[in-house]
Amino acid sequence: MQQLEKQSDLASWHGRLSLTYEKKAHQTQVQQSYHQAPLNLQRPFYPEGPVCHSVMMHTAGGMVGGDRLSINVTLQPQTHALLTTTSAGKVYRSNGHGAQQTVQCQLDTNAILEWLPLGTIVFDQAQFRQTLQVELGPGAIFCGWDLTRFGRSARGERFMQGDWRSHTEIWQQGAPLWIDRQWLPGQPDIWESPHGLAGQPVVGSFLWVGQGVEPNLVQTARDLWQPTTDGAEMGVTRLPLGLVCRYRGPSSQAARQWFIQVWNLLRSTHLGRPACPPRVWPL
């Protein structure tokens, strides 16, 4: 048994990515970068001047049981970075072990991080746990989203077996600003339940945390959603220092398009610059 566990461990990926951003010559730059396969980072680009756009890559194509990914991001004072991915991540059916991803972000004074990965496809019978921990310094802002598709819908696959857990925490100077724990076991009754997926394969969350949002902008965010006839549902909630949007429905693209509109709204009103979708996005 121990020999089998050792073989499984050797066959698993333990990917790491560590990034530190600094403000230099009126521009945010990558000061330090360390990566361990299968995680990697493309060369940063600057489509909007001082903001550093960085693209993360998973060169193995997806995660299997036993894989572990660890991402650490540090933003020094006054920096502004946007991180995204080249494609949606994939979590394949479990081999008896779980896959996990841990992201830790430290934002110093007045730093801004936009965490905008393209999403995750969780295959039937997958076991996946993801954790996001963010620590905000004074005046710092975290903007991020998470989009998950349960099952390969185009093949008629649904998430009938498996286990998915997501844990997000955002703190500022010892005070919790947002804590969100989600658990979705793969079961037919959970798939159909209105308290689960309600028969819909896609769920998503958009977060803006660290700076207050006026009530009129909350209503504007709701109005940006275009009602559909496919059973999709949305919601927007104002936080003491931010805003959260939720989506449940059939379309990752529809959710992403709405999130981009909300992102553009908050960027324009709070940062004085419109949204600038990264060039790698399939828009």
From Swiss-Prot:
Signal peptide: none
Pfam family, one: UreD
Protein name as it appears in the record: Urease accessory protein UreD
Gene Ontology CC terms, in alphabetical order: cytoplasm
A GO MF label: nickel cation binding
Location of this chain's protein in the cell: Cytoplasm
Task of the protein: Required for maturation of urease via the functional incorporation of the urease nickel metallocenter.
Subunit structure: UreD, UreF and UreG form a complex that acts as a GTP-hydrolysis-dependent molecular chaperone, activating the urease apoprotein by helping to assemble the nickel containing metallocenter of UreC. The UreE protein probably delivers the nickel.
Top-level lineage group: Bacteria
Primary location class: cytoplasm
Keyword Acetylation: no
Keyword list, A-Z: Chaperone, Cytoplasm, Nickel insertion
Similarity remark: Belongs to the UreD family.
